[in-house]
Amino acid sequence: MKDVVALVTGGSRGVGRGVALALLAEGATVHVTGRTMTEVEAKAHPQGSGSLEGLQAEAASLRGRLVVYRCDHGVDAQTEAVVREVGRGRRLDIVVNNAWPGYEHMVEDEEFTWIQPFWQQPTWRWNAMIDVGLRSAFVTARAAAPIMVEHKRGLIINISFWAAELFNGNVIYGVAKAAANKMASDFAHDLKPHNVAALALYPGLVRTEAVMRAAEFFDLSNSESPQFIGRVVAGLWRDPDLMEKSGKVHVAAQLAQDYGLSDIDDFKPRPLTASDIV
C-alpha cells in the first residue's frame, strides 16, 4: 500500500490508533488527527494515556509515512482545515471516520455510568456522540469526497457497532451508530457513479484504553486488538469487489475470515452476531 493515502480521525488512541498503525505497517501514508498531542497532555485525559506524540514513536519503525494533526473535531473549521491540508497532495484514498469522544468518563467514581438509563444520562454525552462523533464524520466525508470523486476511486468507512440495530446499554450510543450506518448507506448512493465506496464497519469488543480501564466489566476472551480493524481496512482496499460492499454494514471479524486475516497475536476473533449483543 505504499502509494495509498489515508486519513484516520481520532487516532491518538483506541481503534483509530490501531487502524493507523496497521496501515503504516502496510506502507501507506497515513494522516491522523487527535486532540491529545503530547504524553504530558495524555496524563490529564479522561483515559489517562494515548497521544499523537506516542503514536509517532510507535510508528517510527514502520514502513509507511505518518502525518499528525492536532484537531478538535467538535470544531468544523479544524476538521475542514485538515482535509484541505491532506488534499494538497491531490490524493486521498481512504477515510476512516473514527473520531469518538463518547467513551470518555465511562467509569465515574468507580461506577460504570455509561449504562445508566437515558433519563440519567448527561447532555455532554449526547454532545460527544452526536455533535462531535457523528457530525465530524459528515464534515470529514463532505470535505474528502471531491478529492476521491476526481480520482474515480476511494473508500469512506464509518466505524459503527451493533448498537445501531439493537439495544446495547446506552440510548445515545444507539442513536449515533444508527445514524452512522444510514449516513454510510446514503454516501454510497451519491458516490456510486464515481467508483467511490462508503460503508459502515462493526468492530467486535476492542481492547482500547477505555475498555481496558473498565476490564472487569467485560469478557475479553473474544476481543480484538485495535490493529485488527486496520488489517481489515487494508483488506477492503485490496478487495476487487469493494464496490459490491458499498452502502452496507460489515462485521470486521467476518471480513477478516473472508480475507484470511488474523489479529496481531494470530488469534482469529469470532464474528459477533445479533444474538451475541442481545
Residue ranges and their predicted role:
Residues 23, 91, 181, 191-206, ...:
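Conserved Rossmann-fold SDR core element
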Residues 1-90, 101-106, 110-117, 124-125:
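Short-chain dehydrogenase/reductase
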Residues 141-142, 185:
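A short, exposed helix-loop element centered on a Lys and neighboring polar residues
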Residues 4, 91-92, 148-160, 193-197, ...:
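Active-site loop of short-chain dehydrogenase/reductase
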